[in-house]
From Swiss-Prot:
The lineage of its organism: Bacteria, Pseudomonadati, Pseudomonadota, Gammaproteobacteria, Alteromonadales. This is 3-isopropylmalate dehydratase large subunit. Its cofactor is [4Fe-4S] cluster. Pathway: Amino-acid biosynthesis; L-leucine biosynthesis; L-leucine from 3-methyl-2-oxobutanoate: step 2/4. Disulfide bonds: none annotated. The gene is leuC.
């Protein structure tokens, strides 16, 4: 928190970043805000670039636009021949559009290519106090740095490319404070799943959330990105964490981060954008970190989640008819019975990756549970680094060998099995322990059944063949 000068109005982190980016507020219309960074990928950008070509427009600020290929790319091969006809068309179209409009592109052959929300921060493209947009719902990831980051639609992608601005209504503010410290075996993924379980998948609708408290402050930048990544899963517009020394240490020296005198000036500004003492939030949610256990989803949205030492809930215990019906529908799809201990649920697929959990810290955590063990009979497990940099670092540390020797498949960077948009997908009836962010019906493939967990929990499930409580011997 920062101290407010006498007679000044106390503001939240979000309010400060918002106010600094309002370009104009036309009467009777939504405010226009400036966009500092625009990230694009092969799926939501083709129509936007086509619109510019038809209108004869150029990019307003090509140096502030960064592109990569991630959603449709193969994690088995870097060859274009490995792609489906549609995927190949999309990546080739992105390459041509970037060439035509002068956009920096990290293509499938670039050593820094990767998932847009992994490579952006690690290159220093993301930093505090900025507004960042991308045609992807998990853009909130970048809020871990104290940036205002959110996903936009294809028509908005075109608008930002052309004007470097966007019309936006100001959101309400919510503070989610996680007090105290978590116990061993509890990760950032467990924290955010517990939050969503508490407020529901629509509890944050209409808000920009600021995550704070000792448990959040104790997280690494990788952990904070995991938390902010799933802000959208509670319905929030964006999630943010106030920048601090952990943030500055992470950014120092990265390719696109400020340098020299600009660095000192930037840090001074970043330190000043924290929420002021006395700032009022529209809503406040509190959790005790000590109460959070390793989490595991049982249904078909991230809010349908319980602790690993719990049981599948019974819809009959739910008083709200709508919620009860939703629970019954979820259990029918997921193929579970009320009262089943979570540790009795067997799996046959494991996915460690996605923009939620594919960073080096995530892979290290998973490797602890893979080392010296073997993937259980009948289980297929894949590990997909989030970027070329993550892959190289993991291989330098020997993590790839740990996974391969245990029977995991070691893949190339990409979005992979998070969504059924490439050649990594589940078959009908498969049950997967996944470190991704969505467990919707068919998300990983038609008829697939997804359980969201942390990387450590996923790796442990891979070797056990079922979910286990990693806080205990197994």
């Amino acid at each position: 928190m920062t101290t407010v000068p006498k007679n000044a109005v106390a503001k939240t982190l979000y309010q400060k970043v918002w106010d600094a980016h309002v370009v104009a507020t036309p009467e009777g219309e939504a405010p226009i805000i400036y966009v500092d960074r625009h990230l694009v990928h092969e799926v939501t950008s083709p129509q936007a670039f086509s619109g510019l070509k038809v209108a004869g427009r150029k990019l307003r600020a090509p140096e502030k636009t960064f592109a990569t290929m991630d959603h449709n790319t193969s994690t088995r091969s870097a060859s274009l021949d490995a792609l489906s006809p549609m995927a190949r068309t999309q990546v080739e179209t992105l390459a041509q559009n970037c060439k035509d409009f002068g956009v920096r592109l990290y293509d499938i052959h670039h050593p820094n290519q990767g998932i847009v929300h992994v490579m952006g921060p690690e290159l220093g493209i993301t930093f505090p106090g900025t507004v960042i947009v991308c045609g992807d719902s998990h853009t909130a990831t970048h809020g871990a740095f104290g940036a205002l980051a959110f996903g936009i639609g294809t028509s908005e992608v075109e608008h930002v490319l052309a004007t470097q601005t966007l019309r936006q209504l100001k959101a309400k503010t919510m503070k989610i404070e996680v007090r105290g410290h978590v116990s061993d075996g509890v990760t950032a993924k467990d924290i955010v799943l517990a939050i969503i379980g508490k407020i529901g998948m629509d509890g944050g609708t209409g808000y920009v959330v600021e995550f704070c408290g000792e448990a959040i402050e104790a997280l690494s930048m990788e952990g904070r990105m995991t938390v902010c990544n799933m802000a959208i899963e509670m319905g929030a517009k964006a999630g943010m964490v106030a920048p601090d020394q952990t943030t500055f240490d992470y950014l120092a020296g990265r390719e696109f981060a400020p340098k020299g005198e600009d660095w000192a000036e930037a840090v001074a500004y970043w330190q000043a954008i924290k929420t002021d003492d006395g700032a009022v939030f529209d809503a406040v949610v509190e959790l005790d970190a000590a109460d959070i256990a390793p989490q595991l989803t049982w249904g078909t949205n991230p809010g349908q989640v319980v602790a690993i030492d719990g049981k599948v809930p019974n819809p009959l215990d739910e008083a709200n008819p709508s919620t009860r019906a939703s629970m019954e529908k979820a259990l029918e799809y997921i193929g579970l019975s009320a009262g089943t201990p979570m540790t009795d649920i067997s799996i046959n697929k494991v996915f460690i990756g996605s923009c939620t959990n594919s960073r080096i810290e995530d892979l290290r955590s998973a490797a602890v549970h893979a080392k010296g063990r073997k993937v259980a009979s009948g289980v297929t497990a894949i590990v997909v680094p989030g970027s070329g940099q993550v892959k190289a670092q993991a291989e330098a540390e020997g993590l790839d060998k740990i996974f391969i020797e245990a029977g995991f498949e070691w893949r190339l960077p990409g979005c992979s099995m998070c969504l059924a948009m490439n050649d990594d997908r589940l078959e009908a009836g498969d049950r997967c322990a996944s470190t991704s962010n969505r467990n919707f019906e068919g998300r990983q493939g038609r008829g697939s059944r997804t359980h969201l967990v942390s990387p450590a929990m996923a790796a442990a499930a891979a070797v056990a063949g079922h979910f286990v409580d990693i806080r205990k011997p197994y």
